[in-house]
Amino acid sequence: MTIEALRTPDEAFTAVPDFDYPVHYADDLPGYEGLRAAWIDAGPADADRVFLCLHGEPSWSFLYRRMIPVFLESGARVVAPDLFGFGRSDKPVRQQDYSFDFHRNHLLRLVERLDLRNITLVVQDWGGLLGLTLPVDAGFAGRLSRLIVMNTGIGQGESPGAGFDAWKNYALSTPDLPVGRIIARGTPHLTEQEIAAYDAP
């Protein structure tokens, strides 16, 4: 099945500050053939440990720009994927293509592709909703060593709640979501250049 998607041009990322890390792409992850997945992969490929950094909504891997150097200084490898719909990854056009399983399975396929082991899973916001469920997958469980959990939770299978519904309604009613300004509300020390970087995708 082909999924129609949009792609942010590379030129949109030329002015992104403090984020000069190797970007990798794959358009052949099993189950996602034709969709381009993007991720940052920095540090030694043969490092004995890896930090896997999962961003939330509505950000992208740029969120980790200040943490990546700290992780790299420890001698570790750092992998920070952009979920589909965010950052440098393709953005499926149809709303129904976005589901929990769609995002979760993308992460599992990427971990398998890169054969990541001794993982410190770093999760924030929606990255936690997705990432904290990865260890129940038999193929992932033996790869995980540590967790860093920030500003997130894990669902209980009940209704999403008023806060989620309010966010969803806001996002659906806003034709051009001001991502940089949304992030800046909770992070008032951001520069205008950093705010623009959140808007880049």
Model-assigned labels for residue ranges:
Residues 57-68:
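The serine-hydrolase catalytic nucleophile loop
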Residues 31-34:
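Per-ARNT-Sim (PAS) sensory domains and their PAS-associated C-terminal
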Residues 53-56, 80:
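Structural cue for short, hydrophobic secondary-structure segments
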Residues 26:
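Short phosphate-coordinating micro-motif centered on Lys-Gly-acidic
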Residues 2-23, 37-45, 50, 63, ...:
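Flexible "cap/lid" subdomain of the alpha/beta-hydrolase fold that forms the substrate-access gate
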